[in-house]
Amino acid sequence: MSKATLQRRPLVKKILDGADDNLLVIAGLGSPNWDITEAGDRPLNMPLWGGMGAPVGMGLGLAMAQPTKRVLVITGDGDMLMSMGALATVAAQGPDNLAICVLDNEKFGETGNQATHTSPRNNGPTDSGAGTDLSVIAKGCGIADSAMVRDQAEVAQLVKDLRMKKGPVFRVVKVMVEKLDFVMPPQDGAHLKDRFRQALLGSA
């Protein structure tokens, strides 16, 4: 079982504290959606309700289309495992305004907390994963600035890196398994797209 001590909601709140119009946020489905909404719903948040595996590719495209903006992708380990190939494309394109934060609780939280491949190998029936280290995979894909964060002492630097450091930046943050209330963003996908577009580009 993970020995993580970081709580995801306070962490995401710190990451997004003081977010302005320069910060564009893409959140993977499920818990990252609830996390960014708990921190404060805003038009320049784009929560992906059902797009498992999509946030990194979407974040890359947005970073390339909006090079003067900071693009932050916040997603989970299950989602990132589904779209690892996107990391090689991020490395190939090398956008300096893109940061990716994977909140890794070693579980598929939306389907019953089954172990993901990032959980330890042969550690009992609820944690029988492969010990996959997504930060090592990102580095192997060519993202040089890739690291794992485990401790509260590392959080202040994590926030600075995600918000300001030249990208692409990739961080895996080990977080606790918690049972948290859902804090729902708007559920209409067309509305989310339209308000994001208007906030970013203005009225057509």
Region annotations inferred by a language model:
Residues M1-S2, D17:
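Helix-loop-helix hairpins and the membrane-proximal interhelical loops
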Residues K3, Q7, A27-G28:
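Short, contiguous, pocket-lining structural segments
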Residues T5-K14, D35-D194:
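Thiamine diphosphate
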Residues V12, A19-L24:
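Extracellular glycan-recognition modules
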Residues N22-R42:
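Acidic-glycine-rich active-site phosphate/pyrophosphate-binding loop
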Residues Q198-A199:
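A short, surface-exposed interaction/processing loop segment used at functional sites
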Residues G202-A204:
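Charge-patterned, long linear interaction tracts outside catalytic cores
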